[in-house]
Amino acid sequence: MSMHINNVITHLLYKNESEELQLGLRSEPIDSKSPNGEALVVALHRFYGDKPKGFAEFNYQSDFQEQLEKFRLKEINFYEFSSWTVTRLKDELSKYPFADTGVLALVEYSHLATEYLIIALLPIENSIRLDDGLDINITDHVEFSKITIAARINITDFETKANDKYITYIKGRVGRAVSDFFLDCLSACVTLNTKQQNTVLLQAVEDFCSDSKLERDEKESCKKRIFEYCRDQKKNGEDVQLQELSHELPRNNEGHTFFDYTQEQGYELQESFPVDTATVRKLTKYVGAGGGINISFDSILLGERIFYDVETDTLTLKGIPPNLRYQLQSRR
C-alpha cells in the first residue's frame, strides 16, 4: 500500500469507579516506522474506507481548525495537538449517553498524494488466548468492526480549498447523536447529504427518461447503465461525476444532455458526490420489506412475470424460483 505515516499516537479513555470518563495520556507519539504503528494505521485506513460517511466543513472561527493550523505551521508539535484534541473529545463525549471507553487514536498520514488526519475511538474487547502450555489467558484487542466514532480530515483539500467536503465522519449506531458529537468536537457543520443527492439523481434520471419519451426497454437500459457507472465508481473509490455520468445517457428530444437537463430543471445536484449503494440499487431493482416479508426483484420483470394491482394492492408472481418452490412444496 502506497502510504507514508507521519505521526501516530494513542491515548486511553476509561471510566473511574464513579463511572466518570477519564483520560490517560501517552507520554510520546508511537514510532511511525514501527511494525505495530504501521499495522494500526493500515487497519484503520482500510476500515474507514468501507464505512458509510457524512461530509462536513469547519465552522467560521473553529477552535479545532485553529489548533490544526498551528500544528501544520509547526507552532505546536503533534503531541501537543493530540493532547488538546483528545481532551476536547473527552469533554464533549461526557455530555452524551453513548460515552464509550477505548483507545483514542490520532493518525497523520499520506496516501496516493493526499494527506489525511484520522481521529477515532477504538473499542477494546477481551478475548481468550492459549499459550504454549495450553493455559488460558485473557487479552485485550481492538475491535475494528465496532468502531462508531471516527472522523477523517482531507488535509490536502482543506489547505488548497478544493471543496467543502474535506471532513468525513462515520454515521454511527445511534445515528444523528454521533454525528452531532463529532461536528461539535471539530466545530464543523454538515455540507452534503449523500443519500439525498443519490435520491435526487434517481428522480432526475426517471424524469429525463420520461420526458425523452423513451420506450420501456430503452428506459431500463439507461437505468442499468447509470447503475453500472455508479457501481464502478464506488468500487474504484471514486465519486459520481455528473458531467461524466451524463455521457451514459442519450440526448433528449431537444438535443440536450442529461447534465444540461438537470441544470435547466433546477435539480439540486452537486457536480460530484459519493455513491450510496442502497439508493442507486433502486435503478434496477424493486426492494421492500415489512410485516415479515422481504421482496426484491429486477425492475424489468414488472409487467412480465410480476404484476401489481393498484386497486387491491396485490403483487402477482408468475414462475416461482425453483428453490422457493421446493421449500413451499416440502413444507405442505
From Swiss-Prot:
Highest taxon of source: Bacteria
Protein known as: Nucleoid-associated protein VVA0877
Chief subcellular location: cytoplasm
Similarity comment text for this entry: Belongs to the YejK family.
Membrane-crossing segments per the record: none
Keyword Cytoplasm: yes
Pfam family, one: NA37
GO cellular component: bacterial nucleoid; cytoplasm
Subcellular location(s) per record: Cytoplasm, Nucleoid
Organism: Vibrio vulnificus (strain YJ016)
Annotated GO MF terms: double-stranded DNA binding; single-stranded RNA binding
Keywords, comma-separated and alphabetical: Cytoplasm
